[in-house]
Amino acid sequence: MKAGFDHEKYLEEQSKYILERVNNYDKLYLEFGGKLLFDFHAKRVLPGFNENAKLKLLYKLKEKVEVVICVYAGDIERNKIRGDFGITYDMDTLRLIDDLRSYDLEVNSVVITRYDGQPATTVFINKLERRGIKVYIHRSTKGYPTDVDTIVSDEGYGQNPYIETTKPIVVVTAPGPASGKLSTCLNQLYHEYKRGRVAGYSKFETFPVWNVPLKHPLNVAYEAATVDLKDVNMIDPFHLEAYNEIAINYNRDVEAFPVLKRIIEKITGEESVFKSPTDMGVNRVGFGIIDDEIIKEASKQEIIRRYFKTGCEYKKGHVDKETFERSKMIMEQLDLKLEDRKVVLPAREKSAKLREVSNKNEACPAMAIELSDGTMITGKGSHEMDATAAVLLNAIKYLANISDGIHLISPVVLEPIRNLKSKALKIKNSALDCEEILIALSISAATNPTAQVALEKLSMLDGCQAHSTAILSLNDEQIFNKLGIDVTSDPEYATENLYYNS
């Protein structure tokens, strides 16, 4: 897909704007909403956007920046998972620290928010401290969010410890939403002013894009991505009243603004410089858009992708019916159909043909991949391998101009692996999944030059689209993500077996 977004222009504009904001204060607490790293949603809806743009931005400012990571104790206790990586929030925190350090960015500390002695959280705290990570514990703020007099007092923010920082910009981030970032920023403002320092707060959140129309697919795609949070985009009424200008924000920020403004005014002892929640933001992503039509089409595709994802989550019992229905309503707003995702029909047609040939009324999983040149490649499940493995092999064979009749992996390699699964490990389904087939292919490549040529084509799948007629296992989904393939699934299980890796 062609670029519709200028990454370099955006980085320049964004870093300049943040530095302008920090000039007004001794210290700026910058709340980072959304994903700090691996923001694949932004990459999909803004072709040309780098998924680690925020990290690259911080690297440009690294002499002035240190990072505080917030983790909500309840998320650790219930093993909340980051969907795009399939890892828990505590593990994602460790990964985030490693990634920040790899860019020479200073990680100040981890703040455990709303801690109440949860056992799993205590273990996590011990793990961090024994690895030399500074940990601060914040308990629930008394009076929050409505009793401003109690919140801004020694009984409220004063009860939580002050985080010692040294740089002029303190980035406050988290593995996911509702982790206590805002509360941590305000807690710090309270302590800074108690110490006689002038500190400020700003918010850096990519979506919704404030200077893009309300019903633009880019902003609608944000609603599709947050159906579980029930976020609704809206015109910022405070911004309209103050400046007679239309700016887009979302319901939670708009609803929280009056109280947030009062808290800041109580802390600082003077009228807030912010006239609206949009004023608090420093987001300049809208200025990086160079082709609106490309952005619109990419955003529509993301809305369809999110509908499939929500459908699968509903099937698994992870979201309620209201969330699924809301996802459907968003599709209807833009008059989108599932078949507008080009790769869907070839996969379904392949599955239908397999069912017709088998003459059985049961699921016949199939997959399709759309290559960068628009070619559709399909794959089906068999005794040797599942549909995910088959479609990957078929795709790289096509890219390497290898005939269908040539086997990339010798039975001498395949059979021992299948025997290991069925006999030694006693796994009922001995068909190889996509990870196993790639390992088998790499072994074959050591002695088979044709397999080596095919293996080298895997990188060409980065950015391709894929669709499965059955819900993928978590492992298969992760392999496709690692290969850079955007994959969706129909909300149907591959078998009637209840013990399914989902």
UniProtKB/Swiss-Prot annotation:
Organism domain of life: Bacteria
UniProt xrefs under InterPro entries: DUF1846, DUF1846_C, DUF1846_N
Record-stated family: Belongs to the UPF0371 family.
Protein name (Swiss-Prot/TrEMBL): UPF0371 protein Clos_2302
UniProt source species: Alkaliphilus oremlandii (strain OhILAs)
